[in-house]
Each structure stands twice: as C-alpha cells, then as structure tokens.
C-alpha cells in the first residue's frame, strides 16, 4: 500500500500503540553512506526495518532516536524515528549512494543480534557482528561501528514476516531494551555526543567521516594543563621557578666608610647618610663616635707583669694585683686581707703556691646540677625499691592492722584501732570507720 505525503513511512508517531508496548531500541540510525542494494544479504537474514500494515498504520521501526533514549533512558513511549531528508532522497534514483566507501561516525553502533528471532539476548556492543563486517566492504579498519543499510522507498517488506516478528518479539525487545541501556555505556561516553554537532553530521554525507570511535578531547585539556615534559621530564619551569637563589645585587659596591668592609650581615648609615658596617654602626650608635680602627693593646696578665712586686710580701706572682691605701701595688692575698681586717697581712701566712678555686660554675648552674643529681638519685631511693619498702613497712609496724601488708597511713586519732580492722570476717568495720 502506498503512503501519502502527509504520512511518511520513515517517521512513526511517538504515541503509537506499538511503541507504548515497549517495542523500541536504544539506538539512533543516522547512516551517512550506503552500499549498493545488490550487496545486501538475503531478506530472511535481515531484520525487518520498517513495515506498514494493511490499514495504513505505521508499525514500530527497528531503530529509534537514541539522542533521547540513551542519555536519559526515558519510557518506551517517548521514542521517535528520525531520518535525514537527504538520505531519503538518495534512494529515489536507486543508482548510487551519497558517499563512496562506508563511513563510520559516532552514531554507527552495530546491533549484535542478527535477527529479531535470535535466541540469545543482545544489545549494543563495541565490536561489530559478523553480518556488519561482511557488509562493510569499503570500510576502513579504524572505523568498526556500522549499521545495516536502510532499504529504499520502493522496497516493501514482507507483511507476514513483519506481523509475526512484531507479535512474537515484543517481550524479547523489552528485555533487549533493558540490556542495551546498560551495554550502551561506552557509546554514551565516547561516541554519543559527537554527531550532535551539525558539522559532524554533515561530514558523513559529503564523504568519509574523519571521527574515530574513541573519544577525542579538546586542545585545552592538553595544552594548558599538561604540557609535554612538565611531569615526566621534570622540567624546572613548573616546580623550581620559585627556588631562585637569593642574590645580593643591591649590596654590591657598598663599602664601610669607617673600616672599609665590603660584606656585613647588616648595612647601617651614619648621620651623614654614609654606609657603615654592622660593627661600626653599632659602635657609633652606642658611643657617639667612630669605631677605632686599631685595636688597643691588651694589658699583660697581672701574674706576668714585669717589675711588679707586692709591697707587703714581696711576691711577684698573683692572680690579681691590687693597691693599698698608699697606692702601692700589693698581691691579691695581701690586698684582700687588708680590706677585710684593716691590717697588713702577716708574712707567716705567705705560701709558695697560689691556692685557687674553680669559679667557672655560677650559682645557677650549681643549683641546676644539684637538681639533676637529685633526679638521678631519685630512682635509687624510690619508694618502690625493696629497701624503701622495707623501711616504710618498719615505720608502719607500730600501727595495729589486722593485715600486716596493708600500706595505708591513716592517722590513728581519727580512726580507732577497732575501726581499722579490714579483715574479711568483720564486714561491719568498714561501715563503722566511714560512719
């Protein structure tokens, strides 16, 4: 039966009763290039694509719109069939296809089941079936995803096959619809959205499509974030850009106007703005004058001062030279004795050697040393040592306990001896002591 222009056979109504029964699939067939109809497999090996019954109503097609079904998984009655008008016009002449070889795009997902009456449940797969591989004679090796070609307009399918196939495979199509929703994950992520762009859809009509089934990402994923060699080669441009050595370029050419130093931890200035090194600047700040360049000669040690002798005992060696009331130099012993007793030190107290004491340790260090010594001796005299326990037990032996091993030191005036009896045969003694 011929179809009028108002009811095209390639577009089915979205609310068709057959579609409400779940007879749809989760894939969209927008095939860009077709082969010669003479190379088609026999009709009994192909699935019934589109059928029209005797009443002129449309039978649900083999393909449905995957743009609406794959990403969101709607109910079965939301699907609709879409076919490009240019593809429909290509079958009117019946002489040649739009493109030369079979071009695969992102929508060319094969169906794994060879026929509707196939026993094993199938779905969308990333590997082409044997029937699809045999059809794609001019197919290039990287593009593995193809559809069976759509029959031309003048070819009318067998009504007996269509009616029997539509009635017997309704439940089978429902099962495959559910299975294909979960098997289409690869196509959903990698191949589904490429043909949404008009440039991708038109590229297959003009010639061979250049898209691969593997997802290609934009340039800003690799150009901006991952530069070649930034991670693998360990380029220092990303990781060691801030690790620059500190240069002292601002201090080059400076010189202290007092001592002539060229390197100092801190440069200072005098009242006139000239640079001073840290030492000269501090000296000028504290004393109000320039730091002397020549160090003063150190005085000889008092014990080795030549030509000096004690005015009292006539010794020439001492740790500290002092002066008496008359201004004469005296040794440390004679001067200290006179300071304390107001009389000269007797010569009988003179000694050949100098008695000295170790004054290097200050009083604070002595206290800390005593504290550390006490801490070191603490484990030795701890109350948990056996000797300390024995002494503690001997000191508590005069307290009348019913158990000699009890170690509670409770004052006896507060608790009478009768109340301190903790024997198991006197349970009321604890109540008496607490009461």
Curated annotation (Swiss-Prot):
Any GO CC annotation of this UniProt entry: nucleus
Residue segments, region Disordered: 1-42, 138-177, 350-386, 407-435
Zn finger (GATA-type) start-end: 256-280, 310-334
Top-level taxon: Eukaryota
Entries under SUPFAM superfamilies matching the protein: Glucocorticoid receptor-like (DNA-binding domain) (SSF57716)
Subcellular location: Nucleus
Keywords, comma-separated and alphabetical: Activator, DNA-binding, Metal-binding, Nucleus, Repeat, Transcription, Transcription regulation, Zinc, Zinc-finger
Free-text tissue specificity from the UniProt record: Expressed in the embryonic nervous system and in adult reticulocytes.
Composition bias, Basic residues: 357-370
Pfam families for this protein: GATA
Start-end of Low complexity biased regions: 157-169, 407-421
InterPro entries given in the database record: TF_GATA-2/3 (IPR016374), Transcription_factor_GATA (IPR039355), Znf_GATA (IPR000679), Znf_NHR/GATA (IPR013088)
GO biological process, one term: positive regulation of transcription by RNA polymerase II
Protein name: GATA-binding factor 3
Species name: Xenopus laevis
Organism taxonomic ancestry: Eukaryota, Metazoa, Chordata, Craniata, Vertebrata
